[in-house]
Swiss-Prot record:
Residues 308-364 are annotated as: Required for interaction with other NSL complex members. The modification Phosphothreonine is found at T131. Pfam families: zf-C3Hc3H. It comes from Capra hircus (Goat). GO terms for cellular component: histone acetyltransferase complex; mitochondrion; NSL complex; nucleus. It is found in: Nucleus; Mitochondrion. Non-catalytic component of the NSL histone acetyltransferase complex, a multiprotein complex that mediates histone H4 acetylation at 'Lys-5'- and 'Lys-8' (H4K5ac and H4K8ac) at transcription start sites and promotes transcription initiation. Required for NSL complex stability and for transcription of intraciliary transport genes in both ciliated and non-ciliated cells by regulating histone H4 acetylation at 'Lys-5'- and 'Lys-12' (H4K5ac and H4K12ac). This is necessary for cilium assembly in ciliated cells and for organization of the microtubule cytoskeleton in non-ciliated cells. One of its GO terms (biological process) is chromatin organization. Component of the NSL complex at least composed of KAT8/MOF, KANSL1, KANSL2, KANSL3, MCRS1, PHF20, OGT1/OGT, WDR5 and HCFC1. This is KAT8 regulatory NSL complex subunit 2. Keywords: Chromatin regulator, Isopeptide bond, Mitochondrion, Nucleus, Phosphoprotein, Ubl conjugation. The modification Phosphoserine is found at S147, S149, S168, S172. Its main location: nucleus.
Length: 492
């Protein structure tokens, strides 16, 4: 049997063809030190070290410096002639620029003689020597030259027209009084600083006006929004918050849809807190520290309803009720309801204080009185009924310069039955007293406290006896009263 052998050749199906990499140019083969410059095409050295290869079609540049007389060490291509001059790339460029400048200098402008030759055709000959034919031929020649000169001119294009500012003030008559160096374009450092300062001030004023305009527009739009919102709330009523009781199926569906629209794009949880903090920071950055106490919740109102009408008072911070309806909040901590009395209950909110049972001002119980006033001493009736003529006034008790302060010994303070002892001040030592005991009493030291104590004991024990015996030794001397007049004492 003949066997058939089938050789399957490998295919490139499913294999990624390798991308041919571009060969990097080889570096220069300079032996004295490593050079990273690429080689010239077909050579082993770069353009800087190509002179190391003697067989390379390069030679040293032919430029010789006029300052130091040295020759340029750069390489230049060999010329076709053996003794030809060849320059490197840099000196060849400089040589071309010099030739171009020299050609401009050698090409002068139009000279006066050439201009006169061009205008000689317009010169008029003498009238006597001219014939009609010559004059006619001269006129036709002038017309031909004019038509030829007109035909030589090319039509003017848009690019060839004058490009100037139509509102330019260069030719204005009103600007003659300005600075002639305004359009010079050259300024000193002080002038540049002054001009830039004026421009910045003008720009700042324009920016401030623009910001004020934007603030006005923002306030106007906010006012319109609040007005439309109020009109909408008055038209819809409080049915959005009280519930769908008493509504038709279609109205309930519309109410549900409206609530969904109101909750759309509303932030909750952490996002709401972060958004509020962002607003507060923006307000502090724009309005300053004066607006720090004003928060975004200042426009929120109380959620309580009185007779199906929502309360218009502002809610307390961090709450949803005002001060009047704070008791409706089940999560309150800083307020309690007043207990009132058993007969008349009271539900007014009262802030929690140090007391355990806070009360409103109407039901507040006063604490017991800590201070007790002293008891007034009872005055006997016989003292109250005493004659008032026996008391001296304050004016009578004041001493004068001419008369000394003296008291009467018969002055009855308590009553007729009790008289005070005589005062030692009543004795005048200047008087000539014939009675030696009285004189000794007036001149000698007197124990006032001892006499008053003895007189008091005598008044308690003897009663009216002392009142009869005490003034006896003083009967012979004159006694001055409170009025300063001496009166004789009488013994009853």
């Amino acid at each position: 049997m003949n066997r058939i052998r089938i050789h399957v050749l490998p295919t490139n199906r499913g294999r990624i063809t390798p991308v041919p990499r571009s060969q990097e140019p080889l570096s220069c083969s300079f032996t004295h030190r490593p050079c990273s410059q690429p080689r010239l095409e077909g050579q082993e050295f770069c353009i800087k070290h190509i002179l190391e290869d003697k067989n390379a079609p390069f030679k040293q540049c032919s430029y010789i410096s006029t300052k130091n007389g040295k020759r340029c060490p750069s390489a230049a291509p060999k010329p076709e002639k053996k003794d030809g001059v060849s320059f490197c790339a840099e000196h060849a460029r400089r040589n071309a620029l010099a030739l171009h400048a020299q050609m401009k200098k050698t090409n002068p402008g139009p000279v006066g003689e050439t201009l006169l030759c061009q205008l000689s055709s317009y010169a008029k000959t003498e009238l006597g020597s001219q014939t009609p034919e010559s004059s006619r031929s001269e006129a036709s020649r002038i017309l031909d030259e004019d038509s030829w000169s007109d035909g030589e001119q090319e039509p003017i294009t848009v690019d060839q027209t004058w490009r100037g500012d139509p509102d330019s003030e260069a030719d204005s008559i009103d600007r003659d009084q300005e600075d002639p160096l305004k359009h010079a374009g050259v300024y000193t450092a002080e002038e540049v600083a002054l001009i830039m300062r004026e421009k910045l001030i003008r720009l700042q004023s324009l920016d401030i006006d623009q910001v004020k305009r934007l603030q006005h527009l923002l306030k106007e739009k906010k006012r319109r929004y609040l007005h439309n919102r109020k009109v909408e709330h008055e038209a819809l009523g409080s049915s959005l918050l009280t519930g769908p009781e008493g509504l038709l199926a279609r109205e309930r569906e519309n109410l549900k849809r409206l609530k969904c629209l109101r909750r759309y794009r509303q932030r909750y949880g952490v996002k709401a807190l972060l958004h509020r903090q962002l607003k507060e920071r923006r307000m502090l950055a724009t309005d300053g520290a004066a607006q720090q106490a004003h928060t975004t919740r200042s426009s929120q109102r109380c959620l309580a309803f009185v007779d199906d009408v929502r309360c218009s008072n502002q809610s307390l911070p961090m709450t949803r009720h005002c001060l009047t309806h704070i008791c409706q909040d089940t999560n309150r901590v800083l307020f309690k309801c007043c207990q009132g009395s058993e007969e008349v209950p009271c539900n007014k909110p009262v802030p929690v204080s140090l007391s355990e049972d806070p009360c409103c001002p109407l039901h507040f119980q006063l604490p017991p009185q800590m201070y007790k006033p002293e008891q007034v001493l009872s005055v006997p009736d016989d003292l109250e009924a005493g004659p008032m003529d026996l008391y001296l006034s304050a004016a009578e008790l004041q001493p004068t310069e001419s008369l000394p302060l003296e008291f009467s010994d018969d002055l009855d303070v308590v009553g007729d039955s009790m008289q005070c002892p005589p005062s030692p001040l009543l004795f005048d030592p200047s008087l000539t007293l014939e009675d030696h005991p009285v004189k000794e009493i007036a001149e000698g030291p007197v124990d006032i406290l001892g006499q008053m104590q003895m007189a008091g004991d005598g008044c308690r024990s003897q009663g009216p006896r002392n009142s009869e015996k005490a003034p006896a030794p003083l009967s012979q001397s004159g006694i001055a009263t409170a009025n300063g007049k001496p009166e004789p004492t009488s013994v009853s």
